[in-house]
Amino acid sequence: SKIDVQSFADYYLISEWVENWDTFKSSTFCYRDGADDVLHMGPVWDYDSALNNEDESYGVSDPHADYAMNIQDQQRGEISLTWFTELMKCQQFREVVQERYQHTMRPLLENWSETCNDYRSTLENSAKMEFVRWDLKDQPGTARADESGTWQQDVDKLQDWIAQRTAYMTKRFDDEFVRRGNQADSMTLGGLNDNAVKLGAGQNKKYTFRLTPAIPCG
């Protein structure tokens, strides 16, 4: 394989869970540690447009829908940003995704509500002063300004959305996920049908990597 499969699976799961609109559109990083190294995904960055903090018209607000595995973008007449869409065609990649969710990510999410409540208590005084200092209520300039209210209401909405999203993810990445897949298996972990894969990096750059076939799927 020409990629660090686990890093791609982890990056996918984080992007899918929070429905980050910027995934592969901007602030997306990957690296190789030398010419002979595989391609690693990460580190994660720029999540201000995640967790239901984006306009619904962008398609990133439904806690009961797949997002990251269906990302596509139309540029210069070409469909790009389809990394996860293509990787999901490979049963081996789906196996890694399912294993990483069930054994690594899911246990971490079990205490998310308690952690959120701890932060709510810690930040209470600062949050109140934030609204006083900046007069944030009902002000334009944020993607979800039409739904802004008290900071407590915002936290409640966040917790409700996360609860729904986590429940969906747990149901989605069961054992059947590996078998049914997203689309028919047609690729290898070493290459996407020997096609070039394009990754958007900022507004003015587009990097292309060609991954050669290595490990058959199925």
Regions found by a protein language model. Give the residues of each.
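Middle-to-C-terminal accessory/interaction subdomains
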Residues: 1-25, 31-186
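Intrinsic-disorder/low-complexity, polar/charged segments enriched in Ser/Thr/Lys/Arg/Asp/Glu/Gln
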Residues: 204-208
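Acidic, Ser/Thr
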Residues: 209-214
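Short, solvent-exposed loop/linker segments at the N-terminal edge
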Residues: 195-203
